[in-house]
């Protein structure tokens, strides 16, 4: 009987130790002291891999509209976000908001190449002031969506340039008063 109690106690101790050590894992970033821990923690993109039905749905999405809409929709084909002379507002960033997680969750090289076709012009558009994106866009809203995209890209790629663009942009926001309403 003592052996069973000892074994049970040992197993429980291992489980508890394993669970608490997980909270210190990079995939489970908690709030630093003295902040209260959140009940739910957002996991970094890619820390959970889709399988089964979910993977099938994502593969259908990759073979469908998300994986191909930028091949034929003029607003995306010629988007200023990817270096063209077309649409410069929010369509490109919203498209990327779906494409980036899809490409990296599926580990799909074709989609990752598409992501790079968009991300490289965005990263290289960052100015010394911190503003980035198409030159003809003067509205802050599309950059809010683009910041989310850059953060997703940073999480899956580790590309520090994406994080630097976001940091520079937030410095710009701190130093530049709001320009609402848009006068143009």
Regions from the language model: what does each represent?
Residues 17-18:
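C-terminal motif of bacterial Sec signal peptides marking the signal peptidase cleavage site
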Residues 10-14:
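Hydrophobic helical h-region of N-terminal Sec-dependent signal peptides
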Residues 2-9:
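Sec-dependent signal peptide recognition
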Residues 21-184:
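Glycan-recognition and catalytic cores of secretory/periplasmic carbohydrate-active enzymes
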């Amino acid at each position: 009987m003592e052996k069973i109690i000892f074994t049970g106690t040992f197993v429980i101790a291992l489980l508890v130790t394993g669970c608490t050590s997980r909270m210190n894992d990079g995939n489970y970033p908690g709030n630093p002291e003295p902040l209260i821990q959140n009940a739910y923690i957002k996991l970094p993109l890619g820390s959970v891999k889709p399988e089964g039905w979910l993977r099938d749905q994502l593969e259908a999405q990759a073979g469908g509209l998300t994986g191909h809409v930028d091949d034929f929709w003029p607003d995306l084909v010629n988007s200023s976000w990817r270096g063209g002379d077309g649409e410069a507002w929010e369509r490109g960033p919203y498209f990327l908001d779906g494409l980036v997680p899809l490409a990296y969750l599926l580990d799909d090289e074709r989609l990752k190449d598409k992501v790079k076709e968009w991300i490289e012009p965005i990263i290289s558009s960052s100015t010394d002031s911190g503003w980035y994106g198409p030159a003809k866009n003067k509205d802050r809203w599309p950059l809010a969506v683009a910041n989310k995209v850059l953060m997703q890209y940073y999480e899956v790629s580790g590309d520090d340039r994406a994080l630097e663009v976001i940091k520079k942009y937030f410095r710009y926001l701190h130093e530049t008063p709001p320009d609402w309403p848009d006068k143009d």
